[in-house]
Amino acid sequence: MIPTQPLTADLDCDLGLERPDRPEEACGVFALYAPGEEVARMAYFGLYALQHRGQESAGIAVFEGDRVMLHKDMGLVSQVFDPEILQQLQGSLAVGHTRYSTTGSSRIANAQPALLETRLGPVALAHNGNLVNTVELRQELLAKNHELTTTTDSELIAFAIMEAVAEGQDWRGAIESACRRSQGAFSLTIGTPEALYGTRDPNGIRPLVLGTLESNGQTRYVLSSETCGLDIIGADYVRDIAPGEMVRITDAGLESWTWAEAPQPKLCVFEMIYFARPDSLFHGESLYSYRRRIGQRLAKEAPADVDLVLGVPDSGIPAAIGFSEALGIPYAEGLIKNRYVGRTFIQPTQSMRETGIRMKLNPLKDVLAGKRIAIIDDSIVRGTTSRKLVKALRDAGATEVHMRISSPPVTHPCFYGIDTDTQDQLIAATRSVSEITEQIGVDSLAYLTEQGMLEATRESIGNFCTACFNGRYPIAIPEEIKRSKLMLETVTA
């Protein structure tokens, strides 16, 4: 293992210096099998494209037969890796990960990929998602005297693979066994000495795509959380890995089979609304185009008599353009985003916090002065930063501020890999629209309906998980977890 020097990256910032006022993604995974290529460098670029899915830590494991080298650390991909480190990571198979965690679990031990030694050799695992039976799995492993070194469910899946191998199963059987023991959301990329594996849970809640890269007359296979990870290395998108599907990639090519007994798609609709990059495809559909369509639908459902339409950078912009197009109202770039504000700047004073919104977004006074504006955003979670944003717009001279949200109200927490608050902290779970309108200080507020959100997709509307909007969870949540939103991140041995 290459020695690392942990980099502190423990400050949260967005629209002010508090936690972002929207759900936060948990992870991005990227892997490829490409003998003769610089797989670590390719994985680096893939993770760089997936940086929006996790900014806390990053890691890459590289295999050459039974030999594996791993480098992971706290920080952004560009902070964790440099040319010298990548040069040391030589091999034919790479598994990479970029991570966002919930509060309290920000430590190097939880960075991925998870790496364990088994009877058949090393296994490296990268995971996007969250299990809901983590307490049960953890207790089972501790009862067998396994020494757990992290507070992640990803380590539990890796240990389940190790146990199955110890019982005599081959890699394929062991990975399938671990998947069957795991309940919840998981998209996995797994490196072993003999193959690269990729799989999704039976509901396919978290995304995983397959791509190909032509090199020296050979077809190489790539796995990524999003197609933008394929684009950056020049790989072609082939298809999404199906719910409950597993693929195995070796020198012989690609094998695919369904390990789940009755897969039932329940894709995370928030991937389409916000999480995934707008230049990615979601099951073959352009997310930029989808977000423009939901903006158009929002304009139909909740028009506004205004002079200008603005989008909250960056995620609110496509919907704002669609809203503007549908109503024939000019779209304006009235908010300038400072793209160099991140999670590693100096701790602010309280006075800085009170005016901190301008560290990330600065209104253009000459655009906004004397104008009635509609501001479009993808979601409201707590309402804290929305209130600050509205105040900043009024201070810049806007005479009216009407807010439109391109998703339904978030009323329930996510248990499948998205960092949301407990239900009592979700503003739409405890307040009416009129109360939220008053609290954040807008002249009017409206949300896209759930029907409008789903009808704008090209997928069957029954194929989505919409639990954060209606509480209908596709995978049963244990009551003790539902009451407290106690995920493994907060469990200690």
Swiss-Prot record:
Bilayer-spanning residue ranges: none
Residues that hold Mg(2+) according to the record: 315, 377-378
Record carries keyword Ribosomal protein: no
Domain Glutamine amidotransferase type-2: 27-252
Keywords, sorted A to Z: 4Fe-4S, Glutamine amidotransferase, Glycosyltransferase, Iron, Iron-sulfur, Magnesium, Metal-binding, Purine biosynthesis, Transferase
GO biological process: 'de novo' IMP biosynthetic process; purine nucleobase biosynthetic process
Residue ranges listed under propeptide: 1-26
One example GO MF annotation: 4 iron, 4 sulfur cluster binding
Binding site for [4Fe-4S] cluster: 268, 414, 465, 468
Keyword Nucleotide-binding set for record: no
NCBIfam families, A to Z: purF
PANTHER family: AMIDOPHOSPHORIBOSYLTRANSFERASE
Function of the protein: Catalyzes the formation of phosphoribosylamine from phosphoribosylpyrophosphate (PRPP) and glutamine.
Name assigned to this protein: Amidophosphoribosyltransferase
Source organism of this protein record: Synechococcus elongatus (strain ATCC 33912 / PCC 7942 / FACHB-805)
